[in-house]
Amino acid sequence: MKYPRDLLGYGQNSPKVVWPKRAKIAVQFVINYEEGGENCLLHGDSASESFLSEIVGAEPWPGKRHFNMESIYDYGARSGFWRLHRLFTAESIPVTIFGVATALAKSPVQVNAMQLAQWEIASHGLKWIEYKNFSKKKERSFLQKAIKVHTAATGLAPKGWYLGRGTENTVALASETGSFEYISDSYDDDLPYWITSKNAPQLIIPYTLDANDMRFATQQGFNSWSQFFDYLKGTFDVLYKEGVEGSPKMMNIGLHCRLSGRPGRLMALKEFIKYTKSFKDVWYAKRIDIAEHWKKYHPPCEKKINPYQMTKGQFIGTFGNIFEHSPWIAEKAYSRGLNPSMKSPEATHGFLCFEFRMASDKEKLKVLKSHPDLALDNKKLVEKLTTSSTLEQKGAGLTSLSDRQQKEFNQLNHQYKEKFKHPFIIAVKGKTRSQILRQFKIRYENSRADEFMTACREVEKIAYFRLKELF
């Protein structure tokens, strides 16, 4: 069983990003060109469009044209697009178009204007519709048609992909084509990242639904240009400061011709562009520029081990002895569900410890009893040690004791086990013999309950050290 969501991402280990000219932030504007590709009886759909318009809360009209809705979308193509085009060309700011293929096919003049401005035209799918109920086969068919129609409408195959209203299969289907330099059906980070796909590593450049004018057309959204400006400014300020502090990020801004192309909303963009241009070291980029930069300076790297990609046998074989002679812990972790977050010793340790902590005290005691005595002098028992235990004890100097030292350890082991009913357990890595002996004597004074908890914590520490060796 696998849980496909990666809830860790880069975590505390963000890559050291150096944008071109050492910019503190990459600012990326997307204009979604959807007009003419939305739900409409004229397009062969069963109902009218209801999404992202001035009519907040609109419902589809089955079997009927919604003339007002069509007219609102028409505004985006007829007027809104050109207003945005004038703004960005005048400011010399590059743009990525997310172009719905059937919309582009109906707008050759607008497409020509995009190309003359040297904007990137990425694919936004075949139609601007809801895909949530599509079968994998049908979605693949629409994807292939989107590429074909896009190529015919623009003269070039798209290098980027963003469907928007997709399914759990969208990213995999787009990736398996091998056609896209990046995919943007993701909202989970402020930086690009690589994923494992069927054919080769796939670059993901996350998009945004917060710094997005769509919130003018949703409940609890923006209702004035100043609100949109304030939100964009706040986002920019935080990310720019992070860049100054040494951790540059990417700021996505999502726009729609029929929304931001309205005069009252364009003011937000004008003021925001003016504001950002008052700062040094801002990189205005197309998404394809970011993709090419990332591919060059942050290429995919092969992981030493990748737990998420392991079979059950591989996972248990690799992690079965992380908790001494207790492969059931790894088995339970696998059964609960591997996930992509298991990319570091810290993450994998957390998932394995969860299973150990969920166990009953009786099960935990079995794990404690699976650990060897320290400084074993019984050859037969020594031969039963796991490789990890042998190396750990050797590293602490417990395999080369004098007769006097051996006698002292034997006596302490015997007394401790008589009192607590399990071996003395301590993560010996980095500790000297004298430190271990001191802890032996201190912990002997604990109550059984306190020592049981202490021993369990030491088991977890040992597990972490073992995992670090693997990663």
Model-found features: residue ranges?
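Charged, compositionally biased N-terminal leader segments and the immediate start
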Residues: 303-321
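A non-catalytic, amphipathic alpha-helix used as a structural packing/dimerization or gating element
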Residues: 83, 141, 145, 231-238, ...
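A structural motif
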Residues: 197-216
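C-terminal amphipathic alpha-helical segment
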Residues: 210-212, 217-228
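Catalytic alpha-helical scaffold of carbohydrate-active enzymes acting on polysaccharides/glycoconjugates
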Residues: 2-203, 229-253, 259-302
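Aromatic-anchored, charged helix-turn/loop surface patch used as a conserved interaction hotspot
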Residues: 309, 331-412, 462-471
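C-terminal non-catalytic interaction appendages of large macromolecular assemblies
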Residues: 405-471
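Residue-level signal for inorganic ion chemistry
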Residues: 326-327, 424
